């Protein structure tokens, strides 16, 4: 098959959805399929794969200064020449809407994967998440030709609402929007039963939903030599290990802040990964005098 995978934030960004998309592309290609990734153009990154199609983008200062896809009339038509057999959106934003338009134009199936508990990010990225929900509240019904989805509270209402009430309101709104997008697709994929249940119960998902965890290429780790590890375990030591991108929503800071409350000095914390939060985490460990633990 010729497959188009649509994603709103791809390389050089480092996060789980981008990694999952790359793994999916490679796995499908290994099975003999022809796979294209459609993503916003990056001004700082050159692709070495002619099966990555970049669409126009603009820097979005609300969304962490990332390049956001700029969708305009006629863009879906430019992709007609690829004659996809199926499209698969990995995110439900601008480029995700483009996937919807391409599927409609080419009369082909559209599958979407909801990877992220977006509403769990409100505490860590309040401006980014709430601004995104407000923007999608206005734009998504127009793009999908569906009825309006839950009016966003007015500025006056927001002033009188507690933080928890605001979070609950935007959380519910976010799931309704995500499910509304998925309901316009032929099928929805969730990496976990928990996320699928939220989409159905809170979002109102009615499209067929399949739980399919993201895979890991275990061959990359089978050749590892334990003697090369930078971590040396002494007799009697116990390790708390976190393997994740270093970013606020992964809660590594809470692990560091818990270490001073663990009197047993044989217990060590190992954070494995990289990301934008690394320097802040190192500084916090120094402040609490646990950098050697």
Locations of regions flagged by a protein language model:
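Acidic anion/phosphate-binding donor-loop and adjacent secondary structure
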Residues: 200, 216-230
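Membrane-proximal helix-turn-helix segments that form the acceptor-binding/catalytic region
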Residues: 105, 137-187
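N-terminal subdomain of nucleotide-sugar transferases
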Residues: 1-56, 82
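Nucleotide-activated donor-binding/catalytic signature segment of Leloir-type glycosyltransferases, i.e.
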Residues: 279-293
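Conserved donor-binding/catalytic core segment of Leloir-type glycosyltransferases
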Residues: 189, 232-259, 270
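Nucleotide-sugar donor-binding and catalytic loop/hinge architecture
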Residues: 1, 224-239
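Carbohydrate-associated surface elements
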Residues: 41, 194, 215
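An amphipathic, basic-hydrophobic alpha-helix
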Residues: 61-89, 94-101, 105, 172-176
